């Protein structure tokens, strides 16, 4: 507020001095009648007029600035400023009253020569210091001052100019603010997110498959890992087939396959083959040569490019060829394709066919008169309900028990059947079916190898938990076979299963679930249990 006070004082001082000078000039004009006085009077009038105009202009400009600054400032300060201005006016009047008694020309020369330049320079310097921020923003102080001097600046016009300056100042500050904001922040920010790349999936590349048999090389002495040498179906449908090709599918299936290939692009959701793999048709000579290379070099069964394995040997392959030539059953041909590694299926099904033996499995299916019956025995519809499902499961259990005991001893097919029976006997509803095959199972327990005995003991352990099934296990033949398990050469898992079976039978007798009526049988049973207990303690 110091700058505003100085401006007010300077304004009052200039007004008083201008009025005093005007009165002095008027007195000189009336007193002096000569020519020199007239000239000096004319000169004084010109000077007084020009100076008074300049003072009026400065007065108007300074008043406008005072009004603009007092609007922004506080009201108590404006009151103090008015009081100080009135005091300053009284002092200046006394000074001018004394100065009029002195020499008038010297006063005029001092006022316009010295005080005018000093006051003006001091006034404009103070104004520039007080309005430094506005001058920096506008960068045109001389232009604004010149405009004020040229216009006669009434109070209303000054108010309108002040509003325009405020808008210009806001525009300048706003532009500066947003320009700074643009440099500090992104006007078009992009969203930040994590890109999840899909995991690569290994798929069969159709382009890498050989189109002709000439593109495949066969080594007579293959290394430990031999590349696949399987042939593929030719892309040309008009190509003639060799007479040594095996017909692995019926005519109807071949027709449906050709129709499906034509509509492959429009029906992607429908698989071309029911087992989910495009078959690889091979000649008999090619398959025989592959099996011969494998047997001569002693390497593992090598896979074709679609990662399917063939575990057939030469005699089994020749027998399978004769079977396929004698039947057109689609189920038999499909099983043969799986065994040859032509069709991709679930690993469990592939393992089951390899362990059972494809020739043995097909022979067992062909032993039935109707193909529909073999399909019912091989496939169980689990989504059926009621008596239909129960009858199918019962038929399946009987079929598995019959096939298992009919397989050769310790054969893969027999061991696979024992695995399935062990899973089926976890439910007591199937125990009455397995009980009828106890004599054959105890024979396998006494004559089979370690793996066969382990599988049979698992079946007996499941059935010993049922009192009705455990009652049929209490006979001399069964207990003698169980007692043979306890020797030093038996596997630990088999010993644990045998001990658990004896404990279950003992608990049923103790609880009264099994009642021994014959006294002789009871004494025999007690003697066997004491002998087994002694063997267990010694071990």
Swiss-Prot record:
Keyword Cytoplasm among UniProt keywords: yes
Domain of life of the native organism: Eukaryota
Biased composition (Basic and acidic residues): 66-80, 88-106
Biased composition range(s): Polar residues: 134-146
Subcellular location: Cytoplasm; Nucleus
Disulphide connectivity of cysteines: none
Pfam families linked to this entry: Arm_2
Family according to the record: Belongs to the GPRASP family.
Gene Ontology terms describing biological process: learning or memory; negative regulation of neuron apoptotic process; positive regulation of dendritic spine morphogenesis; positive regulation of neurogenesis; positive regulation of synapse assembly
Keywords for the protein's UniProt record, in alphabetical order: Cytoplasm, Nucleus
UniProt GO MF annotations: protein homodimerization activity
GO cellular component terms, semicolon-separated: cytoplasm; nucleus
Chain spans, region Disordered: 1-112, 134-172
PANTHER family: G PROTEIN-COUPLED RECEPTOR ASSOCIATED SORTING PROTEIN 3, PROTEIN BHLHB9-RELATED
Subunit structure: Homodimer.
Gene: Gprasp3
Role played: Survival and differentiation promoting protein that plays a role in the regulation of neurosynaptogenesis. Induces phosphatase PP2A activity which results in APP dephosphorylation and inhibits BACE1-mediated processing of APP.
SUPFAM superfamilies cross-referenced by the UniProt entry: ARM repeat
Keyword Ribosomal protein carried by entry: no
Protein name: G protein-coupled receptor associated sorting protein 3
Chain intervals with Basic residues compositional bias: 1-10
């Amino acid at each position: 507020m110091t700058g505003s006070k100085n401006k007010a004082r300077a304004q009052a001082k200039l007004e008083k001095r201008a009025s005093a000078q005007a009165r002095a000039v008027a007195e000189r004009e009336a007193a002096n009648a000569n020519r020199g006085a007239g000239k000096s009077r004319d000169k004084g009038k010109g000077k007084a007029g020009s100076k008074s105009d300049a003072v009026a202009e400065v007065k108007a400009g300074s008043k406008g600035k005072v009004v603009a600054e007092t609007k922004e400032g506080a009201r108590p300060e404006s009151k103090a400023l008015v009081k100080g201005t009135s005091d300053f006016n009284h002092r200046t009047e006394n000074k001018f009253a004394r100065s009029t008694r002195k020499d008038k020309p010297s006063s005029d020369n001092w006022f316009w020569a010295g005080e005018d330049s000093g006051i003006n320079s001091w006034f404009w310097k103070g104004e520039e210091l007080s309005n430094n921020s506005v001058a920096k923003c506008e960068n045109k102080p001389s232009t604004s001052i010149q405009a004020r001097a040229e216009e006669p600046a009434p109070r209303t016009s000054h108010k309108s100019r002040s509003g325009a300056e405020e808008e210009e100042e806001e525009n300048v500050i706003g532009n500066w603010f947003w320009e700074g904001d643009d440099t500090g922040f992104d006007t078009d920010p992009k969203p930040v997110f994590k890109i999840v790349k899909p995991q690569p999936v290994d798929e069969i590349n159709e382009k890498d498959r050989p189109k002709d048999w000439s593109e495949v090389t066969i080594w007579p002495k293959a290394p430990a890992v031999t590349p696949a040498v399987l042939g593929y179906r030719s892309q040309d449908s008009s190509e003639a087939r060799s007479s040594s090709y095996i017909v692995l599918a019926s005519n109807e299936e071949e027709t449906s396959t050709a129709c499906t290939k034509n509509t492959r692009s429009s029906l992607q959701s429908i698989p071309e083959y029911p087992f989910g793999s495009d078959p690889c048709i091979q000649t008999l000579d090619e398959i025989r040569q592959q099996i011969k290379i494998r047997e001569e070099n002693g390497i593992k069964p090598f896979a074709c490019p679609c990662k399917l394995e063939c575990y057939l040997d030469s005699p089994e392959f020749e027998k399978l060829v004769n079977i396929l030539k004698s039947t057109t059953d689609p189920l038999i041909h499909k099983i043969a394709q799986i065994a040859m590694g032509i069709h991709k299926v679930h690993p469990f099904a592939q393992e089951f066919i390899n362990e059972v033996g494809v020739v043995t499995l097909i022979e067992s299916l062909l032993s039935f008169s109707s193909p529909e019956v073999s399909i019912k025995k091989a496939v169980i519809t689990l989504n059926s309900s009621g008596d239909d499902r129960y009858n199918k499961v019962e038929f399946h259990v009987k079929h598995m028990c019959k096939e298992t005991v009919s397989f050769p001893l310790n054969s893969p097919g027999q061991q696979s059947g024992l695995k399935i029976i062990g899973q089926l006997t976890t439910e007591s509803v199937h125990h009455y079916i397995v009980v009828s095959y106890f004599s054959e199972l105890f024979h396998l327990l006494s004559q089979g190898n370690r793996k066969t005995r382990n599988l049979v003991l698992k079946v007996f352990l499941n059935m010993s938990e049922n009192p009705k099934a455990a009652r049929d296990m209490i006979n001399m033949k069964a207990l003698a076979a169980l007692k043979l398990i306890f020797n030093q050469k038996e596997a630990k898992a088999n010993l644990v299963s045998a001990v658990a079976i004896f404990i279950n039978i003992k608990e049923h007798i103790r609880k009264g679930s099994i009642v021994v009526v014959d006294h002789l049988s009871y004494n025999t049973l007690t003697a066997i249990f004491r002998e087994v207990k002694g063997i267990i303690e010694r071990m």
